[in-house]
Amino acid sequence: MDMDSILLDAEERMEKALGSLDREFAKLRTGRASTSLVDNIKVDYYGTPTPISQLASVSVPDSRTLTIQPWDRSAFQLVEKAIMKSDLGLNPVNDGKIIRISIPPLTEERRKDLVKVARKYTEEAKVAVRNVRRDANDALKKLEKGKEISEDDVRKSTDDVQKLTDRFVAKSDEKCTAKEKEIMEL
């Protein structure tokens, strides 16, 4: 590996850490309805844990309602049961044709808890970014030990890795601030 490929690899891995943060944030419930709310709910469909999105069409008719329309009539009760068993605090209403879920407004206490969870996810992303930095710096030091690059090149590349790290840590903080604002919005 040369310096450029180490930097590229580090940047890719840092991007993945932020992508993971985005996915975690999508699962966090805000006051608004979102199809991603039910992404992680698995339905026991013919003995196989199956995501709701593979059994039904999920849509958001308005900001406080989710509708789920299972393609198989026999799956209605299964989907309804899976939603009630999830820890999201959602109450599905099954009218035989469609399952409606009204998203209740979040309490102040629940909002504060969600902000804490968002901060925890952000911290985990920052740790992942810093781990990538450590790996990149270790790889650069190995190149220096093997006399493949000079000490000056290592110093310059280490500075580049640090700038990359600072940029991704700042991005994760921005994402966290935006998510906190979204959660606290009434």
Curated annotation (Swiss-Prot):
Entry GO terms, CC: cytosol
Main location: cytoplasm
Alphabetized CDD domains for the sequence: RRF
Keywords from the UniProt entry: Cytoplasm, Protein biosynthesis
GO MF, one example: ribosomal large subunit binding
Subcellular compartments: Cytoplasm
GO biological process: cytoplasmic translational termination
The keyword Cell division belongs to this UniProt entry's keyword annotation: no
Pfam (any one): RRF
Entries under HAMAP family matching the protein: RRF
Family to which the UniProt record says this protein belongs: Belongs to the RRF family.
Summary of the function given for this chain in its UniProt record: Responsible for the release of ribosomes from messenger RNA at the termination of protein biosynthesis. May increase the efficiency of translation by recycling ribosomes from one round of translation to another.
Name the UniProt record assigns to this protein: Ribosome-recycling factor
Species of provenance: Nitratidesulfovibrio vulgaris (strain DSM 19637 / Miyazaki F)
Gene: frr
